[in-house]
Amino acid sequence: MEPNSLQWVGSPCGLHGPYIFYKAFQFHLEGKPRILSLGDFFFVRCTPKDPICIAELQLLWEERTSRQLLSSSKLYFLPEDTPQGRNSDHGEDEVIAVSEKVIVKLEDLVKWVHSDFSKWRCGLQAGSVKTESLGRNGQKEALLKYRQSTLNSGLNFKDVLKEKADLDCLGEDEEETNVIVLSYPQYCRYRSMLKRIQDKPSSILTDQFALALGGIAVVSKNPQILYCRDTFDHPTLIENESICDEFAPNLKGRPRKKKPCPQRRDSFSGGKDPNNNSDGKSVAKVKCEARSALNKPKNNHNNCKKVSNEEKPKVAIGEECRADEQAFLVALYKYMKERKTPIERIPYLGFKQINLWTMFQAAQKLGGYETITARRQWKHIYDELGGNPGSTSAATCTRRHYERLILPYERFIKGEEDKPLPPIKPRKQENNSQENENKTKVSGAKRIKHEISKSKKEKENAPKPQDASEVSSEQEKEQETVNQKSITEPLPIADTKKKLEGYQDFAARPLVSQADPEKDSETDQGANSEKVAEEAGEKGPAPPLASAPLAPTPGTGKQSLTSPSALVDSKEPKPCCFTESPENELQEASFPGFSTTQPPLANQSEVEDDKLPAMADYIANCTVKVDQLGSDDIHNALKQTPKVLVVQSFDMFKDKDLTGPMNENHGLNYTPLLYSRGNPGIMSPLAKKKLLSQVSGASLSSSYPYGSPPPLISKKKVIAREDRCSSLSQAHHGQSTDHMAVNRPSVIQHVQSFRSKPSEERKISDIFKHDKLSRSEPRFSFSKHHLSPSKKSRGRRTVEKRALPHSHMPSFLADFYSSPHLHSLYRHTEHHLHNEQTSKYPCRDMYRETENSSFPSHKHQEKLHVNYLASLHLQDKKSAAVEAPTDDQPTDLSLPKNPHKPTGKALGLAHSAPGPQESKGTSQFQVINSQSRDCHPKACRVSPMTMSAPKKYPEALSRSGKPHPVRLENFRKMDSMVHPILHRKMSPQNIGAARPIKRSLEDLDLVIAGKKARAVSPLDPAKEVSGKEKASEQESEGSKAAHSGHSGGTSEGHKLPLSSPIFPGLYSGSLCSSGLNSRLPAGYSHSLQYLKNQAVLSPLMQPLAFHSLVMQRGIFTSPTNSQQLYRHLAAATPVGSSYGDLLHNSIYPLAAINPQAAFPSSQLSSVHPSTKL
């Protein structure tokens, strides 16, 4: 036949390397065209002398390099044609296959076919299906399709079948001598099927069920069915000249085991690949010893060439390459060290340590990083390195290792140093996954964008140390990062580091002592807080809170809940940082009205307070954010890097100037507290709206969502902080602390007061006394500060914080009503409400009034609060004297009277008894209260009697300028309000309260409008208060003592009497409706009850008064803070139920926490941690 008679039929069915695979080919047999396709059986005679055998065509391909048309076939011989011959075990229809396939050129295969096969008489003569009947019902196509699908691996043979059909139309019967070889199981099934249908027409074999059961429909005229179940080694087949196994295709996939690079390259090198691989192939395909012997020499020859080629490079590698490798490594390590990214350890890839020289050489051979990446050839580099072939991420891991270890040097060599390097975050994350996880855990506040960016910076700054560093080193890095951030911010690095160290020490001690289970987390939190503190510098106290509020469990939440003392300790160092940080200066600049003399102490105490309750800081932070939106002071503090409210608070902590963030921390901490439990750093749209409305309402100096919170700095805490931070903060203390306390007393002081609570808890009674003394001083400074709305806010916060130590809950009330004017307003409100609603919920109304009056007097409130706190400090000694004046004031029946007398003791007890829990909770409350003071709606009407924690409350009374009796009455009213927690309605401040509620927003708007604007507009009221504060400072002092006694009494008399006044605003109307009234137990009466029903005042339940600030600040929003708050309340009040008990007892049921019946529930819901209590 002519060579050109051979041609492929159909389209190619596959490509692999140099091979193109086909399904069929056509040739001419005796002048007749015939098509052989994959899977076809046909008779062949290998040589004229050889017996007839059956060939099964298994593979057809063309080698592009040599243009050879090749086939691979399996040969079947009759048993008698094998060396062993036929025996009794062989069946009549059995054939035996040659163990090795034969590779034959198509032209030779065609020659094999040209023979006379008429002598073949073996095989089962199967009845053929008549093509006429098949043609009529279309079964022939179906039959052929079935055969091709089952016998040809599902390849599409339509085109081949079409060609065959065309040949049939020409009358060419190429299947005249059709033969089929089955496996033994197939043959058995076929015979079984024939037996079952023996009496039926053969066409039934085309039935799909018959085919499925093993029937075979043969359309050829003389089909012969045979089966094969054994193989043999043909002795002389390998000697056939037509068989050319050297052309066997190399169809191996990727090597499952590492092969020498040269062999692998040769295997992919094209034309000679089959020969090179014929060694393996021959063993696999030909078991004949002769065949193997023939193939081995070829392979050995090829291998010899390879070896000879490889031996020289190996020798060179042994000598030259070693020198080159050493020089390369020296240069690489030197360069990487110079660029501040030293190669500390060489990573492992595929369970094998990377050879940097091999990796570099392989990359250069493939064209370098850019080329390899573009061509996606990193897997080749991985293979060169000899890694585990089973890795599914080999390419990515190899590329990242190269980017981190070698790419900078490659760019340096090529003079492309200016070319930006690809981001190596994934690489860093892989190396520092554990450390990064720890960091994430430690700084939960990193969720906030700002903090996230800082964490990224930290990671970038400390990725290398992280690789080898332990958790401690991670914390150190965090601290370093914080320091760096602090440096970025005004806070000095040294001071930041010192603060961080002190903070770590304090945080570690209290955490360890207070909550072993949370010890680790707290330590991490402490480190995180330190880190944040360093980052935020002045923000120091707030950043830990910020991070904690964002991730309350990892950081602030745990500290505040687990160990108030730890918080105090950790936060105390932060106050130092705060004092030192330029943020204080910013705050001072922001709030120039604040006097610098008092603020340092206030800042220290604030810092301590901030340290004590992380949630408080968180709340303060939140407040700051709100303030920064709403108040110029806060905005000044935050203006460096203001962001979204809640997010901003945390971001502010980290990214804002240290001074600004410190001041902001109190306010910001409030806002984060709002969202800290449930959504650390994440606010629902409704909450955001409310918070924004609060912020807009708090645009004024006292425009904190809760009104500018009265200073939460307790002098005791301030003093403690001064002692702790004096060394660090002395440089910045005069400026930063004063500025901080003065600039943003409400926010920072609130936060600081919370933070300082843990330490206060440790020495509550002593601190309470000390606080009173300290507060007296801060009160005056703050009063000066309060002269300006910003100063008042800061002073108030500072005072609140100072008052906090005395009675966490009472001091919180004092915070809420720290300013004398607010306090008096609160007292009036309390009195009127008591008179009006004594039977029902006088406290609630009082709270509303207080809120209303509180906002107008917010600025004064800060001032008053400071004075009041100072008074509380003084009144710890003069509690009895102050109690009388308070009694003179119209008393709200809902408020307990006895708290006035125990002010000093009760407050001390409240601080000491609550221990970490109460101090934390109180701190948080105080923070909230101070914020509420900023927009104190609750205490607005009771202007003289701003109800904050007992200490703060007396201060507020003193500052209110009202007689101590009025303050005491207000405090009592607050106490009673604590029981009847129904003052949500007074929630113009509630808007600023824990959670921005629609009603809160409305109230805030009203406050802004001037209806409840007194409490709602902290700035303007703060201004008013500033004037009032001066007059009311004296009163504050007197009423401070009275209120301290009152709060203390409340604490002793009720589980949460002091707290109650603090929380009513938080929970019920006061919580949402009146920031000032939150001290009152108005909505608190029954923790669950009043939380659920603001209208229900249950004396059974110790009034857990959450200041609206507290609620707005999110104290209850974060489960940790709320629990801590509750615990603080329980500890503070002799009623003896812990926060957990209170929470469990429904003092702060979820519904109670969100007492929106009396006031817009949205406010509480956004803040309350009800779902997490």
From Swiss-Prot:
Composition bias, Low complexity: 547-557
Phosphoserine: residues bearing it: 267, 1017, 1118
Changes after translation: Methylation at Lys-340 prevents DNA-binding. Demethylation by PHF2 promotes recruitment of the PHF2-ARID5B complex to promoters.
Bias (Basic residues) ranges: 253-262, 782-796
GO cellular component, one term: nucleus
Top-level taxonomic group: Eukaryota
UniProt cross-link Glycyl lysine isopeptide (Lys-Gly) (interchain with G-Cter in SUMO2), position: 130, 449, 497, 499, 763, 769, 878, 901, 905, 920, 973, 985, 998, 1040, 1055
Statement: the UniProt record of this protein carries the keyword Cytoplasm: no
UniProt-listed PROSITE patterns: ARID
UniProt-listed Pfam families: ARID (PF01388)
Subcellular location: Nucleus
Positions bearing N6,N6-dimethyllysine: 340
Comment on protein domains: The ARID domain mediates the interaction with DNA.
PANTHER family for this protein: AT-RICH INTERACTIVE DOMAIN-CONTAINING PROTEIN 5B, RBP-RELATED
The protein's name in its UniProt record: AT-rich interactive domain-containing protein 5B
Gene of this entry: ARID5B
